[in-house]
């Protein structure tokens, strides 16, 4: 059981951390563009594009089950960590974009204008000026993404069979011929929750700053 737990724990850790980092990186770039530039895609403007990202959360996971199952089977991504990382990145990306868009909107544009006058490019101003200021929001988005991906069960149970199974799938499988093994399930659940509690305590000040950013003007 110990070896099985460690294997599932590392699967969850690798998948959750990688997908959260990827989502925060991509989401921050998208959110910065939506907060600073005026886009037009057909009839859609910035606000419509932002709402489109948020509307992806309306779809229940079961609606996406069959398409992803067929797609992953054709791409040989079933029961792989990279498959879960890509899927989890897509699932938390809309939330990251909304959090970071509000974060970037609360930062004065004069800072970037001054950086451009000093000779920096837009990308240089974003990476050296804006990102350090927006760090609390990025940490908050990372923690939220980490919690959501760490606790995700449906797709992990659907798209994995042995190698890439995660901790929630192992916790849910604590059943036998005599029913549910409550002691084992309780111990595994505590072990699964503990890392998130430790991370939240360590990064508490960033979470508070990030979630409060943009609340007042």
Where are these regions (language model features)?
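A structural signal for multi-pass alpha-helical bundles of membrane permease subunits
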Residues: 1-217
């Amino acid at each position: 059981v110990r070896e099985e737990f460690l294997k599932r724990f590392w699967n969850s850790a690798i998948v959750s951390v990688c997908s959260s980092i990827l989502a925060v990186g991509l989401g921050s770039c998208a959110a910065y563009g939506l907060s600073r530039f005026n886009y037009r895609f057909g009839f859609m403007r910035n606000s419509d594009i932002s709402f489109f990202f948020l509307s992806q959360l309306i779809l229940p996971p079961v609606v996406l089950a069959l398409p992803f199952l067929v797609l992953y089977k054709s791409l040989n991504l079933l029961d792989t960590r990279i498959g879960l990382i890509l899927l989890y990145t897509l699932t938390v990306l809309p939330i990251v974009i909304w959090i970071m868009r509000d974060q970037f909107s609360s930062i004065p544009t004069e800072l970037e204008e001054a950086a451009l006058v000093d000779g920096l490019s837009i990308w240089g101003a974003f990476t050296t000026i804006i990102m350090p200021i927006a760090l609390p929001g990025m940490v908050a988005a990372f923690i939220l993404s980490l919690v959501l991906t760490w606790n995700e069960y449906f797709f992990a149970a659907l798209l994995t069979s042995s190698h890439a199974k995660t901790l929630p799938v192992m916790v849910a499988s604590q059943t036998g011929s005599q029913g549910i093994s409550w002691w084992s399930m309780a111990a595994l659940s505590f072990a699964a929750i503990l890392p998130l509690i430790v991370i939240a305590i360590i990064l508490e000040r960033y979470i508070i700053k990030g979630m409060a950013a943009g609340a007042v003007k």
